[in-house]
Amino acid sequence: MIRTALAASTLLLAAVPAFAQSQQDALDARYDRALAAGYKALMLCGAIANAERNGATRTPESVEQWELTGIQAPHDAIIGTLPYDIIRRPSGQIAHVAVRWADDMPPRIAANFGPETGCSVLPIGAPEDTSNPEQPLPVAAGVEPKVLGTGTLSAAPRRKAKAPNALDRVFDSALAGHYGEGTRTTATLVRFQRSGSGLVEQSSYAAGFGEKTPQRTWSVAKSLAATLIGAAVHSGEATVADPIALNYWTAGGATDPRNAITIDHALRMASGRYSDTPGNRTDALYFGGSTIDETAMNWPVLHAPGTVFRYANNDTLLALKGISQWLSFYPPDQFFAKLGMAETVAETDIRGDYVMSSQVWSTASDLADFGQLYLNDGVLPSGERILPEDWTTYVSTPSGPQPDGAFGYGAGFWLMNRSEGVPADTFAAFGNRGQYVVIVPSRDVVIVRRGEDPAGSGFDIAAFTRDVLAALPTN
């Protein structure tokens, strides 16, 4: 009898963990559907609304073909099954996108908050009437509703290359997928100096994409964030040695080691902080509707700041907290306007904090303007300096711990100093799904490649850079 009771107890104890695991699996599957729906809503809203802002057109079918295929598991298998509605205001502008994912919950909502900050995904469970389609959108200064993107680009004059040349052949190879199996190039653009012609720009686009078509920059946004921080440093509002010192850290006084984390540590991906997912996966923030404060700020340190490299979205978001007061007076849209980047939008979480680890939409030409700023050592074509004199050197110089692999890391930028056949001073902004802005100071060249590469594929940016440089005149 005793033996039988013990056996029954053992079976019961074994069953409880199995039941708990089964319940957890069901919760995880439901959460994955909610995240996939948020991803779909935000991509549809961002791609279409930001294109229309620029005077371009993206259809839902185009977004489903490009942005919504080849994404990371498990969302890739879910997204195509989720129905959606695009709700427009009487003006014709997108109000929000609703994606249905569960019979007992409201659809996931991505709401369009206007031309200055674009679309934000709302929290899971937010009611659809949170985004009122009758409420008119604000209009950014100098921007007309519906027919947008008329602002001037960089004031530096540049000519379009016309005759077919060696660079066209490199572009054609990229569009044909020759720089990585399965890669999908949407745009290539090179800006360079030609003797007797000045600044020349040459570009090529996949069908359905063009000069005014924005795409999500993904982690190229990290380099844009580092540039914003440079502008704050130049204005005297911060130094990279400043501790970030969030209020809820300083409340703990000397007992909280996170008070030692500086802007420099965060820009160099060396805060020493832990997170429970790979550093490039912050799905709860990006697609779950959580906020930066909720998801990115409170992780503990596992290593002394400045001693270990760990690529992390959270570190870029932390670095921006170091200039949060400055950003409240000088938001990204004003900074982009100063650079002539009229077709670039930095989006926010629902509290208005900029998700500049990833959530920026921009065109290839605007990103070339961004790269040109570094070739000009932080000076605008008007002659106004907006970055410190040593900022280009700062962001492109390795310091402290470095990543393993083919590329080094500076401060918010990747370094191509390990890439054979590429000038050692080359540095770059890299982003998910094949976003690249390559800056080659010694050749006075900016190279932009946009793509929607599927997960698991890889565009060979070093080979592409070598081929582009070989195709250009050496003056």
Residue ranges and their predicted role:
Residues 166-209, 437-438, 444-448:
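A short, well-structured edge-of-sheet supersecondary motif
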Residues 45, 226, 315-325, 358-380, ...:
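Active-site-proximal alpha-helical segments within enzyme catalytic domains
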Residues 250-282, 286-307, 311-317, 362-365:
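Conserved catalytic neighborhood of penicillin-recognizing serine enzymes
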Residues 22-25, 58, 114-115, 123-139, ...:
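Structured C-terminal helix/loop/strand segments within mature extracytoplasmic catalytic/sensor domains
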Residues 196, 215-241, 266, 319-323, ...:
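Active-site SXXK
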Residues 344-345, 392-446:
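Active-site Gly/Thr loop motif
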